[in-house]
């Protein structure tokens, strides 16, 4: 799997912008997601510790933005590190997802 990742990275076309590069990185990383329960014996998957790709991250180091998606929400979200006052912010943690299910948008065809 890591050989394939390297191949995709080395042969992917250069993108015009940082954001297009991030989207391309997620397309490449999609190939390596591990579905829930595939690394556990049949019927033995743990409900509280999923054996799956729990989150995927791509970082724009030029613009200091961290992009991520999770196993519960494949929409790409971002954190702009330039907006954080690291000298004054206190450590805390929070869940990456408020709801543990994929959002689905209904498209009405008229």
Give the role of each language-model region:
Residues 1-110:
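C-terminus-biased signal that marks the final domain/tail of proteins
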